[in-house]
A protein has these predicted regions:
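C-terminal ends and interior cores of transmembrane alpha-helices
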Residues: 5-20, 210-222
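Hydrophobic core of transmembrane alpha-helices in multi-pass small-molecule transporters
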Residues: 23-38, 226-240
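Helix-loop-helix hairpin linking two adjacent transmembrane segments in secondary transporters
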Residues: 23-25, 53, 62-109
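Cytoplasmic helix-loop-helix junction between adjacent transmembrane helices
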Residues: 30-65
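C-terminal membrane-cytosol helix-exit motif in multi-pass small-molecule transporters
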Residues: 98-118, 306-311
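Juxtamembrane intracellular "pre-TM" segments in multi-pass secondary transporters
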Residues: 113-141, 325-329
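Short amphipathic helix-loop junctions that connect adjacent transmembrane helices
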Residues: 156-176
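Helix-to-loop junctions at the C-terminal end of transmembrane segments
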Residues: 186-200, 284
């Protein structure tokens, strides 16, 4: 509720900043909107916390399904409402965002979650160094960071590349981003089942391959079809890497440790996304679309190295490439 209130304030002030042409207020407003994003990312952990052990993986995946609806509604509203207020392009879009925040509040008012018990509040915790040095935690965080880093880099630069470098229309860019978001969240219908059956490591590898294919298509051409198909693959690759990483993280902490572990995980993952988003604009405007895609490759390289290290360290112990087993690392 607190995060939603901050987000609503940010959306309202963003609309005002556009109307009055105040760039610094706009930056502050978007910062507030981003705070809501930080709160909203905890929904997946909340779902995992209340799910049974067997259902945790699917719970995380199912939370992501809401993004499919958002993938169609968000870009459509942004496009249709951007000229709602004369001489203030996109101010109307931000006013519509306030309506979404009201809907969030109404849903949260009807949601009942168990309060933290004594085990969570007073249970024994391990030293932070011991928690964060677990191989499973390290590989989970690095995989999610890589997936988000590539996604943020390429996705953020796409509208600029399409409209400025490739001379496509804004409507084309909105169409591509719309389907990218669908690619991000549509796999949620089956990602959880795949992870439950095969384990997270093979699914992370699949996500990496999808990202590599995305980059290859982007380097091959700049038609709308290239952008459209590559951004769908980018979204799917992100989903596989992010959901699998989250699944691995929730296996690395006790109830008393979950707050700090979840917080550190999200700080690292979304910190990477923030840095990638900033770099995307700089690289795109100074070096171009090809450089954006080539700059994404090191993220995937880090994830591959981390996974091979984890496999060689734990393959015999956990049977990583077999059907998923209940184990800890």
């Amino acid at each position: 509720m607190i995060g939603t209130g901050i987000g609503a304030f940010g959306a309202a002030s963003a609309a005002g900043s556009i109307i009055y042409s105040n760039f610094y207020l706009f930056c502050l407003s978007i910062f507030c909107v981003g705070i809501l994003g930080g709160f909203a990312q905890l929904y997946r952990f909340a779902a995992a916390d209340v799910a049974t052990h067997e259902f945790k993986t699917k719970a995380v995946s199912l939370v992501m399904i809401g993004g499919i609806i958002a993938g169609f509604i968000g870009p459509t509203v942004a496009s249709k409402a951007k000229d709602l207020i004369p001489n203030a392009e996109f101010a109307g879009s931000y006013l519509f965002v306030i309506i979404f925040h009201v809907l969030i509040v109404l849903i949260l008012l009807k949601t009942r979650l168990p309060r933290p018990d004594d085990t969570e509040q007073k249970g024994k915790t391990r030293p932070l160094k011991e928690i964060f040095s677990q191989p499973k935690f390290l590989v989970a965080v690095l995989s999610a960071m890589a997936g988000y880093g590539v996604m943020a880099m390429v996705m953020t630069a796409t509208p600029l590349a399409m409209t400025e470098e490739s001379s496509h229309q804004f409507s084309d860019a909105a169409f591509v981003i719309q389907w990218h978001v669908v690619g991000m969240f549509a796999p949620a219908f089956f990602t959880g089942s795949l992870i439950h059956r095969y384990g997270p490591v093979p699914i992370i590898f699949t996500g990496i391959l999808l990202n590599v294919l995305c980059i290859a298509i982007n380097l091959a051409g700049t038609d709308v079809f290239n952008y459209w198909s590559s951004l769908i693959l980018l979204g799917m690759g992100w989903n596989f890497m992010f959901v699998s990483g989250t699944t691995m993280v929730i296996e690395t902490y006790s109830p008393a440790e979950k707050a700090i572990v979840q917080g550190v995980n999200d700080f690292l993952v979304f910190g990477t996304a923030a840095v990638s988003s900033l770099l995307a604009g700089v690289v795109q405007t100074s070096l171009g679309w090809r450089a954006v895609n080539l700059s994404s490759i090191p993220f995937l390289g880090v994830a591959v190295l981390a996974l091979f290290w984890y496999i060689f360290r734990n393959a015999e112990k956990e049977g990583i490439f077999l059907v998923k087993q209940d184990s800890t690392a």
